[in-house]
Amino acid sequence: MLYMIGGSPCSGKSTIASLLARQYQLLHIKLDNLVDEMVSQASADSQPICLLRQDRNPEEMADEEWRFYEEIFPYVKSYLIKNQNRPLLVEGAGLLPHLVKELECQTSSYLCLTPTADFQKKHYRQREWVPYVLEGTTNPEQAFENWMQRDILFAQMVRKEAMKLGYSSLVTDGSQPENQTAEEVARLLKLSNKNRINI
């Protein structure tokens, strides 16, 4: 059993997946936690974006983010194959709809979660590591704004592709409690109530 939450950065994927994994007894896999290993594998295989990613900051990578996820997807796919007998809830921006389509899973097993621009900016500012990413720039505020614009565009691209390919898409704006958003995601993913436990 495989369920996937893709979408764009800072949309609440990890929070929602964590809640659902506990509730539905699924193993929560964060692609972000696997990226370093996958980048190392892809770099060893001479994938161009992965080679560049080692030495570039996020602003320089804006145009390459989409291709970066395409480059590491064979490693994501390999990971999923190795763990196919486990009940997984995998989440991450690297689960691009056209790549997920290659897995030939039911469309209900994938959801695209993207934030409104305001939600994204608010929650990025709360992440403790963001200042460290920006500290080497000459204009941190402009660099942050460019980064946000890149991710806003990425959200639009991934949402449009999900809808085109027939996948469910949900936009988060922070107006409802996390557990309510989690219930909506569970409904869209058609998570089985027979596996559900109350927490």
Task: Please tell me what each predicted stretch does.
Residues I5:
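Hydrophobic anchor at the beta1->P-loop junction of P-loop NTPases
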Residues C10-S11:
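ATP-binding Walker
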Residues S14:
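Walker A/P-loop
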Residues A21-D32:
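Post-Walker A helix-loop "phosphate-sensing" segment adjacent to the P-loop in P-loop NTPases
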Residues L27, S40-P87:
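Conserved nucleotide-sensing/catalytic segment adjacent to the nucleotide-binding pocket
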Residues V90-G136:
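ATP-dependent NMP and nucleoside kinases share a basic, alpha-helical "lid"
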Residues L153-I199:
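NTP-dependent small-molecule kinase module
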